[in-house]
Curated annotation (Swiss-Prot):
Role played: Efficiently catalyzes the conversion of all-trans retinol (also called vitamin A1, the precursor of 11-cis retinal) to 3,4-didehydroretinol (also called vitamin A2, the precursor of 11-cis 3,4-didehydroretinal). Also acts on all-trans retinal and all-trans retinoic acid. The replacement of 11-cis retinal chromophore in photopigments with 11-cis 3,4-didehydroretinal enhances sensitivity to long-wavelength light. This may improve vision in fresh water which is often turbid.
Catalyzed reaction equations: all-trans-retinol + 2 reduced [adrenodoxin] + O2 + 2 H(+) = all-trans-3,4-didehydroretinol + 2 oxidized [adrenodoxin] + 2 H2O
Name recorded for this polypeptide: Cytochrome P450 27C1
Positions of heme binding: 486
Organism: Danio rerio (Zebrafish)
GO BP: any one term: lipid metabolic process
SUPFAM superfamilies hit by this protein: Cytochrome P450
Protein localization: Membrane
Family: Belongs to the cytochrome P450 family.
Disulphide bonds in the chain: none
Gene3D superfamilies from the UniProt entry: Cytochrome P450
Record-linked InterPro entries: CYP11_CYP27_families, Cyt_P450, Cyt_P450_CS, Cyt_P450_E_grp-I, Cyt_P450_sf
Gene Ontology CC terms: membrane; mitochondrion
Keyword Repeat: no
Length: 540
């Protein structure tokens, strides 16, 4: 009875919302007709609306009465799930398990991992429904370990780990600085300086090999490029990651970051084990805390350094100029602990995500020389030999398509989490408020219904044929959607677009004979399962 009552209440609520939506659309249609001097537009809009949404209250209630409970939702048993992850190395195959479960149980299914109950959604339209129904402060999936560490150390949460009004305040500060392409384009000069060092580093590394062309383990190089590029924007300083000798402080950060991702599996183990067992199995939690200690220490040193410089400038009555960090320190829209936390989390989020995408992009270009040549010809036609800027990127649709297609095939986050803010009916099931959802982005991006021939690498699938053509959809949303989408998206795209463009200007990229076919594995993020070794031959 409780379930039926809830469903009927939601049916009435949905019907009321639909009625309001119809009224708004009709009003909009009438407004258009008055503005254009033609009543045909309004009449056509209303006719279409009547045809599309002529659902009676009785039909709406009858439809809602067919809604099922979570008990009726299919999914693997708890024992089967634990066996999959603990004994069959499921942690490194999360992206594959998504597709296996979607094929076996359907595009919405439930699972339990230790104390965590999750509803997984592997359907584009259902994902869209969930994201479009979010509140003003969407809640991510389970990040209790992040919050627990911050409570333990007395640290603030940052944009990734914060929730509610605290998160909304931080986002409102940061979004005005780095969310729009034109805002990020001002960093083109700084990023291009880093790209120039990347090109030099490619030449140095290949000269160390017998064939004078091969760069081994390309992801290590792109990791250092991404770290240098993100830090240049966030901290307004160079770290020396692309030098022959990396400074000690930067190397310590790299070590801490590697530890963070290497401890992903053990941290997941810890999430499935009650806290009272930590004294018996202490290593996962100790490594997790140790890596965060290193990351926060690194950020605090650089933030404090810039703060000291600003204070000296103010004492001398000098004009204070700078970028993102300077703005945050001068305006004081966040306190110092919040700045430490946000700098730490944004750097963490911006390094491996960018480096993995660049690794996959260059690997795909090397394996598809015809496509590589097409993209190079576009770059050469638009730029000639000059260095690109952020303003050039809109005129390089194949470069943009290259990044989008790479992220479709290898989404850095194979899945994303949400906690429902209200009761939802999704896929014919009533999902109660407070339920943890897993949005299966890898599965939707490889779905034939969303992308014909999904296994093929086709950057041109993202090019619009005309102004009315929309090729983007919820099947591939690597940066998320809506108000809780990735805050650093524009920075990451700028780094990738400028780097890929200039690598193609300088080199023809081939797969080294030392590299066999590389498959993806999940290691917190979706990363190459083996070293990618590439040959870089000068174009000139």
């Amino acid at each position: 009875m409780a379930l039926q009552s809830t469903i009927l209440h939601m049916a009435r609520k949905n019907l009321l919302q639909e009625s309001c939506r119809q009224l708004l659309i009709q009003t909009h249609g009438l407004h258009k007709s008055v503005a254009s001097g033609s009543l045909e537009i309004a009449a056509h809009s209303q006719a279409d609306l009547k045809e599309e949404s002529a659902v009676s209250p009785a039909e709406e209630v009858q439809k809602a009465a067919r809604v099922k409970s979570l008990k009726e939702m299919p999914g693997p048993s708890t024992v089967a799930n634990l066996l999959e992850f603990f004994y069959r190395d499921g942690f490194s195959r999360i992206h594959e398990i998504q597709m296996e479960h979607a094929k076996k149980y359907g595009k919405i299914f439930k699972s339990r991992f230790g104390p965590q109950f999750v509803v997984s959604i592997a359907d584009r339209d259902m994902v869209a429904q969930v994201l479009r129904s979010e509140s003003a402060t969407p809640q991510r999936g389970n990040m209790e370990s992040w919050k627990e560490y911050r409570d333990l150390r007395g640290r603030s949460t940052g944009l990734i780990s914060a929730e509610g009004d605290e998160w909304l305040k931080m986002r409102s500060v940061l979004r005005q600085l780095i969310m729009r392409p034109r805002d990020v384009a001002v960093f083109s000069s700084d990023v291009n300086d880093v790209v120039a060092d990347l090109v030099k580093r490619v030449k140095t590394l290949r000269s160390q090999q017998d064939d004078s062309q091969t760069v081994l383990n390309i992801n290590d190089l792109f990791f250092k490029y991404a770290m240098e590029g993100v830090a240049t924007i966030l901290y307004e300083t160079r770290l020396g990651c692309l030098e022959n000798e990396i400074p000690k402080m930067s190397q310590e950060y790299i070590t801490a970051l590697h530890l963070m991702f290497s401890s992903f599996k053990t941290t997941m183990y810890a999430g499935a084990i009650p806290k009272w067992l930590r004294p018996i199995i202490p290593k996962p939690w100790e490594e997790f805390c140790s890596s965060w200690d290193g990351l926060f220490k690194f950020s605090q040193i650089h933030v404090d350094k810039r703060l000291s410089e600003i204070k000296k400038q103010m004492e001398k009555s000098e004009e204070i100029k700078g970028g993102l960090l300077t703005h945050m320190l001068v305006t004081r829209e966040m306190n110092l602990e919040e700045i430490y936390a946000n700098m730490t989390e944004m750097l963490l989020a911006g390094v491996d995500t960018t480096s993995f995408t660049l690794s996959w992009s260059t690997y795909l270009l090397a394996r598809h020389p015809t496509i590589q040549q097409q993209i190079f010809e576009e770059v050469d036609r638009v730029l000639g030999g000059r260095v690109p800027t952020g303003e050039d990127v809109p005129y390089l649709p194949l470069i943009r398509g290259l990044v989008k297609e790479t992220l479709r095939l290898f989404p850095v986050l194979p899945g994303n989490g949400r906690v429902t803010h209200d009761d939802l009916i999704v896929g014919g099931y009533l999902i109660p408020k407070g339920t943890q959802l897993a949005l299966c982005h890898y599965s939707t991006s490889m779905d034939e219904e969303n992308f014909p021939r999904p296994e093929e690498f086709r950057p041109d699938r993202w090019i619009r044929k005309d102004a009315s053509d929309r090729v983007d959809n919820f099947g591939s949303i690597p940066f998320g959607y809506g108000i809780r989408s990735c805050i650093g998206r524009r920075i990451a795209e700028l780094e990738m677009h400028l780097a890929l463009t200039q690598l193609l200007q300088n080199f023809h990229i081939e797969v080294s004979p030392q590299t066999t076919e590389v498959h993806a594995k999940t290691h917190g993020l979706l990363c190459p399962g083996a070293s990618i070794n590439l040959r870089f031959t000068d174009r000139k």
